[in-house]
């Protein structure tokens, strides 16, 4: 009888542990929730729609234009316009697939103030460190001025920009590194909140997830659109999954 009780207790413990892991994994909509009617990548509509389905965060990309303005866009060259060497006016004249104009960061944040989802701001890697420093300074200043510092997290592939966010953002602001070439120990030494690495990096180094947690950091994986990969990451206990399929991920988490 005792052995039977111990067996069932063990099963319940394992099940409860899996449930806790699932509850701890948060959904980040990659470039917003854009795979739905009336939306487009990095559009204001995508931000609103990510908020409407209660995503933890909505990820978006930022460039500094030739006239030192901040705009929201992923590609360095989009619809024939090169972001770094074009003016704000030239960039924002681009029409997105849902009919919106490409937004400025200020426009994007103005809408975000009306919402609850967290802002996962990626600064794109620019041609020079000087450009990145100017961009970081402007971003941090704008975020603070608009009262969004407590809801904003920063991510970047650039080592320089990463260190600048850590240096210039308010103490305790989460800053994650994207490239995938630094160990958990190195990220901790930098002062990062943790890695935001491609799924393939964690497949190669699954031990890094536990190492990060042991060091007090959090773990984000991108861009995860396959159900099996989502299941694996949830089982490994990652804190965040960035996806183009936020509804699918939410459904999987609900079943846990």
Name each model feature, range by range:
Residues 8, 20-256:
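Phosphate-group recognition and catalysis centered on beta-loop-alpha active-site segments
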Residues 1-2:
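N-terminal secretory signal peptides that target proteins for export/translocation
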Residues 5-16:
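Sec-dependent N-terminal signal peptides
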């Amino acid at each position: 009888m005792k052995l039977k009780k111990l067996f069932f207790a063990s099963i319940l413990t394992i099940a409860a542990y899996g449930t806790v892991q699932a509850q701890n994994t948060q959904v980040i909509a990659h470039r917003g929730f854009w795979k739905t009617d009336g939306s487009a990548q990095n559009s204001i509509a995508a931000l609103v729609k990510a908020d409407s389905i209660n995503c933890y965060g909505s990820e978006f990309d930022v460039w500094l234009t030739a006239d030192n303005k901040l705009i929201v866009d992923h590609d360095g060259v989009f619809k024939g316009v090169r972001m770094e060497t074009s003016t704000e006016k030239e960039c924002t004249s681009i029409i997105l697939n849902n009919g919106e104009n490409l937004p400025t960061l200020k426009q994007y944040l103005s809408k975000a103030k009306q919402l609850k989802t967290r802002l996962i701001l990626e600064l794109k890697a620019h041609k020079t460190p000087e450009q990145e420093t100017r961009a970081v300074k402007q971003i941090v200043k704008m975020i603070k001025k608009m009262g969004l510092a407590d809801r904003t997290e920063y991510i970047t592939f650039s080592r320089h920009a990463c260190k600048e966010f850590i240096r210039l953002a308010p103490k305790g602001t989460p800053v994650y590194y994207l490239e995938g070439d630094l160990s958990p120990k190195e990220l901790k030494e930098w002062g990062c909140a943790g890695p935001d690495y491609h799924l393939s990096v964690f497949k190669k180094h699954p031990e890094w997830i536990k190492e990060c947690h042991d060091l007090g950091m959090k773990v984000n994986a991108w861009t995860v659109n396959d159900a099996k990969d989502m299941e694996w990451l949830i089982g490994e206990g990652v804190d965040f999954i960035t996806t183009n399929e936020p509804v699918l991920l939410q459904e999987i988490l609900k079943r846990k």
